[in-house]
């Protein structure tokens, strides 16, 4: 992740994880090429992965979603990071949203 500058600028957010049991990540992307592209929800505050969506499907614009169980407490800065298994197929990020689910 963060191999190219564009991957480092995919937006950030602040979430208070106190009392949160799960977080839903939805990313809107334009998948280019045939490799597997991974979209990671990254806890920037603690330098830990919250979860990853791996997309090995067909190319094109799509919305991907996953739910991750969390056991974090307090306010964390989070961001989306991306990578591809194929060097020339840089992921194209179109937007993201997170939805915290209370325990």
Residue spans for each PLM region:
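Polar, enzyme-active/binding microenvironments
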Residues: 1-103
